[in-house]
Amino acid sequence: NSRISVRAHGLFGSVAGDDANGNNPDRNLNFESKIYEGGVQLEINFFEYYIGSRLHPVTPYIFGGAAVFFFKPYGNVGGERVELQPLLTEGQSKSYNSYAFSMPFGIGVKYSISKLIGVGAEWGMRKTTTDYLDDVSQTYYLNDPASEGAKGLASDPTLTHVAGMQRGNSRNNDWYSFAGVSLTVKIRMLKKEGCLDHQREGY
């Protein structure tokens, strides 16, 4: 209806980070993860909005839902782009799952610019069930990373840490966010005689 709706969504994006540009240059890790997300969301408009409304042509809204996403982190190791998950950079007994769940939620605004066209913008956060979007979660595990080649460089680019030293923070899972704009076109399937909603007085 004009206040509450359910929508399906699909998104693609990437997140990246580099310690050289952050608060932990001594760690010197870097990554980029491609993210493919799909899910469902409940959307609640503040006002009774629909495309073509003259009474409420603009409305803010909030949304929340559930999603599943696929991610694959890469890093620059010795000048080469390397997939990090297979390297087990924290000495895991097996690779972490590349699929995880997230809880999307956020805010947006919609505007009806004509009887048939609407535009919108929104921003949302994703709370996830993984701590490996950046391939960093727990501790270093190599006492001599220089002897492990690319695997050692991916785990400890500075080659200065020893097993057990803190590498990440496993107490908190990772988050990411999306921002975007939308264009919506209203399609009339049947032509009806009489007064349509957007032609009513006050709309």
Question: Which residues fall in each region the model found?
Answer:
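Gram-negative (and chloroplast) outer-membrane scaffold detector with strong preference
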Residues: I4-R81
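Short coil turns and loop connectors of transmembrane beta-barrels in diderm outer membranes
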Residues: S2, E48, H56, I113-K115, ...
